[in-house]
Amino acid sequence: MACEPQVDPGATGPLPPSSPGWSALPGGSPPGWGQELHNGQVLTVLRIDNTCAPISFDLGAAEEQLQTWGIQVPADQYRSLAESALLEPQVRRYIIYNSRPMRLAFAVVFYVVVWANIYSTSQMFALGNHWAGMLLVTLAAVSLTLTLVLVFERHQKKANTNTDLRLAAANGALLRHRVLLGVTDTVEGCQSVIQLWFVYFDLENCVQFLSDHVQEMKTSQESLLRSRLSQLCVVMETGVSPATAEGPENLEDAPLLPGNSCPNERPLMQTELHQLVPEAEPEEMARQLLAVFGGYYIRLLVTSQLPQAMGTRHTNSPRIPCPCQLIEAYILGTGCCPFLAR
């Protein structure tokens, strides 16, 4: 059976299961005369079955949907960037294994294993009342399992280098169109579903604020800025051409084909530390910060996991922070907790 990508037109389609905070986002039907878009407004959602192979996003349908909002974004500008970021086999497997049902299943297995180990260990000691001992074992297993679940939930609130940050190139191409991409996943029946969100955001004010903030940090907090930027890096594998052996001095005497060719030999790979936000002019660094963490912001926005703010700069909701507030407080701030989930 063929797998067809689905398009959710934002406010007019059914509520995606992974967006409990949809009501907190500006919504509405496709715009009429005089209707304006607001920062944080969901434009459309592409949904595809992650259990099918091969798959691809129906970006043509998304392009048509964006045109109904008056946004002209040719899909060719970001098609390869989005699909190469999210649809590689290893990324799709990661999304499945990192889904909420898989985490729940792991927690159940963890509880059973911990309970059995604690119970078997307790049999070596005399605990008096058998039922009291069983209760203590159960409470200990439940406590450890709840701790594991809390660790999982805290991990989900960090920027995910395997999903969120892979959209940096696509978001960099879409910044000038006032659109940001974000990715979430859900499970429908036995199917893993990837959801690609298109959200409207005019980031010029955020760019200006972050430019000024980066310039100020370069002047008065340069060591802190360098420390925070040094954490914004990922490890990448790149292919390396094997060094050719030294041949005869006269190139005319060299054989046309190498003598010790091994067609089944695996290519050489090397790991490189790639800086996500390299040192540059403040405005360029501000745009790069927004591109890198735009996918992270959108995921937190559509799943209602953004930290509550007492005021906002560039969104209509007084309790929803804008991207520059999130980056200022949690990426460039003085907090000691790591913000990348690797």
UniProtKB/Swiss-Prot annotation:
Record localization: Cell membrane
Superkingdom of source: Eukaryota
Spans through the membrane: 105-125, 132-152
Predominant cellular place of this UniProt entry's protein: membrane
GO cellular component term, pick one: plasma membrane
Residue span of region Disordered: 1-30
Keywords for this protein: Cell membrane, Membrane, Transmembrane, Transmembrane helix
Disulphides: none
One Pfam family of this chain: DUF4481
Membrane topology designation: Multi-pass membrane protein
Keyword Membrane appears in the UniProt entry: yes
UniProt xrefs under PANTHER family: TRANSMEMBRANE PROTEIN 268, TRANSMEMBRANE PROTEIN C9ORF91
Subunit and interaction comment: Interacts with ITGAM; this interaction inhibits ITGAM degradation via the endosome-lysosome pathway. Interacts with ITGB4; this interaction prevents ITGB4 degradation.
Annotated function: Stabilizes cell surface expression of ITGAM and participates in the adhesion and migration of phagocytes during bacterial clearance.
Protein's recorded name: Transmembrane protein 268
Source organism of this protein record: Homo sapiens (Human)
Gene name as annotated: TMEM268
